[in-house]
């Protein structure tokens, strides 16, 4: 499939394949781990760690135009209820321990998306004495979303790639 509206194509293919298998055999043979991963893939609970202007673009993904929740994600205020942290903005040396503390409070499996040039590598403030040159020096990052600031579409694409990666399919980045 080509075009802009291919977000649910993989899910539709998987559903069609599952229906064919159920019609042929009448039962489905799988593991508990596969079922749990399938359920987790469709229900990412994310929390924001917005530090600068990228956080404004992050908020736009939850607005009606993009409606991030239609992909099975939901915002959470507590790290103990989240399995995805989106780091957006300039990370300073003073803020780095707080970022690590929040990350450590998240339950397993936990994912991190680094959003924007500042979170990816320090951005415009890269050579400043007080800026961490990328949040991947503090926490392991799964997906990098480039841009200054990245658009809401770029973040949405990054979240969809994380869902593909969590399901075991290769990410298309």
UniProtKB/Swiss-Prot annotation:
What's a single GO CC term here?
Answer: plasma membrane
Which Gene3D superfamilies does the annotation name?
3.40.50.12280
Under the GO molecular function aspect, what terms does this record hold?
4 iron, 4 sulfur cluster binding; iron ion binding; NADH dehydrogenase (ubiquinone) activity; NADH:ubiquinone reductase (non-electrogenic) activity; quinone binding
Listed SUPFAM superfamilies: HydA/Nqo6-like
- Identify which cofactors the protein needs according to its UniProt entry: [4Fe-4S] cluster
Query: How does the record say this protein sits in the membrane?
Result: Peripheral membrane protein
EC class, as a word, reads translocase
| EC number(s) from the headed UniProt entry | 7.1.1.-
Q: Which domain of life is it from?
A: Bacteria
Per the entry, the cofactor note is: Binds 1 [4Fe-4S] cluster.
Q: Which reaction does it catalyse?
A: a quinone + NADH + 5 H(+)(in) = a quinol + NAD(+) + 4 H(+)(out)
Task: Print the keywords alphabetically.
Answer: 4Fe-4S, Cell inner membrane, Cell membrane, Iron, Iron-sulfur, Membrane, Metal-binding, NAD, Quinone, Translocase, Ubiquinone
Location (main, coarse) = membrane
The role this protein plays is:
NDH-1 shuttles electrons from NADH, via FMN and iron-sulfur (Fe-S) centers, to quinones in the respiratory chain. The immediate electron acceptor for the enzyme in this species is believed to be ubiquinone. Couples the redox reaction to proton translocation (for every two electrons transferred, four hydrogen ions are translocated across the cytoplasmic membrane), and thus conserves the redox energy in a proton gradient.
Q: How does it assemble?
A: NDH-1 is composed of at least 14 different subunits, Nqo1 to Nqo14. The complex has a L-shaped structure, with the hydrophobic arm (subunits Nqo7, Nqo8, Nqo10 to Nqo14) embedded in the inner membrane and the hydrophilic peripheral arm (subunits Nqo1 to Nqo6, Nqo9) protruding into the bacterial cytoplasm. The hydrophilic domain contains all the redox centers.
Q: Which family does it belong to?
A: Belongs to the complex I 20 kDa subunit family.
PANTHER family, from UniProt? NADH DEHYDROGENASE (PTHR11995), NADH DEHYDROGENASE [UBIQUINONE] IRON-SULFUR PROTEIN 7, MITOCHONDRIAL (PTHR11995:SF14)
Protein known as: NADH-quinone oxidoreductase subunit 6
The species is Paracoccus denitrificans
> Lineage of this protein's species?
Bacteria, Pseudomonadati, Pseudomonadota, Alphaproteobacteria, Rhodobacterales
Q: Which gene encodes it?
A: nqo6
